Swiss-Prot record:
One of the primary rRNA binding proteins, this protein initially binds near the 5'-end of the 23S rRNA. It is important during the early stages of 50S assembly. It makes multiple contacts with different domains of the 23S rRNA in the assembled 50S subunit and ribosome. Forms part of the polypeptide exit tunnel. It comes from Xanthomonas campestris pv. campestris (strain ATCC 33913 / DSM 3586 / NCPPB 528 / LMG 568 / P 25). Keywords: Ribonucleoprotein, Ribosomal protein, RNA-binding, rRNA-binding. PANTHER family: 50S RIBOSOMAL PROTEIN L4, LARGE RIBOSOMAL SUBUNIT PROTEIN UL4M. Part of the 50S ribosomal subunit. The keyword Ribosomal protein applies. GO terms for biological process: translation. One of its GO terms (cellular component) is ribosome. The lineage of its organism: Bacteria, Pseudomonadati, Pseudomonadota, Gammaproteobacteria, Lysobacterales. This is Large ribosomal subunit protein uL4. One of its GO terms (molecular function) is structural constituent of ribosome.
Length: 201
């Protein structure tokens, strides 16, 4: 498979296994959910009725009218415990390496089919200027949420995009499924394409 490099008549040969794979929504969904869950702190904690501070003495007489109640730490009372109290836990899910890479390939392939994958020779800016990056992106028609992927991290590019909340800059090693799925357009350099193929092939 050959893909056109934007802004020139040149083409780059890419692997069908990486950029021409059939899209599996179930696979991508499972990997994206697992990736996001791995980032959860899992520190939420509530108290059960046995952990709440307070006496367990019976609050009122058994007889004499009114409802029958025991301790005021029961969940039905204000200040009482929580019935099914949340406890700190890990939300991590196991995702096999083969499965993770297959999902990344499926995402790249779908981006290519939808015309949301833009390959460029290079993506350099002369100085660390946010204004310069904005002007460059405006001329490329990349939508509101572009993801710029380079072979190696560029300090100029990273610092220029830091003040732009919807613009992400990653090198190939920093790619993840959530960033790829959430981007309107993925702008990737030709060198980065080769590195992606080495990683996923």
């Amino acid at each position: 498979m050959e893909l056109v490099i934007t802004g020139s008549n040149n083409k780059v040969s890419v692997s069908d296994a990486v950029f021409g794979r059939e899209f599996s929504e179930d696979l991508v969904h499972q990997v994206v959910v697992a990736y996001r869950n791995a980032g959860r702190a899992g520190t939420k904690a509530q108290k059960t009725r046995s952990e709440v501070a307070g006496t367990t003495k019976k609050s009122k007489k058994q007889k004499g009218g009114g409802a029958r109640h025991g301790a005021l730490t029961a969940p039905i009372f204000v200040g009482g415990g929580v019935t099914f109290a949340a406890k700190p836990r890990s939300f991590e899910q196991k995702v096999n390496r083969k499965m993770y890479r297959a999902a990344i390939c499926a995402i790249f392939s779908e981006l290519n089919r939808q015309g949301r994958l833009m390959i460029v020779d290079s993506f350099d800016i002369e100085a660390t200027k946010t204004k310069g990056l904005i002007e460059k992106l405006k001329g490329m028609d990349v939508g509101k949420r572009p993801l710029i992927v380079t072979e190696e991290a560029s300090e100029h590019l990273y610092l220029s995009a830091r003040n732009l909340p919807y613009v992400q800059v990653r090198d190939v090693q920093g790619l993840d499924p959530v960033a790829l799925v959430g981007a309107d357009t993925v702008v990737i350099t030709a060198d980065a394409v080769k590195k992606v193929e080495e990683w996923l092939a």
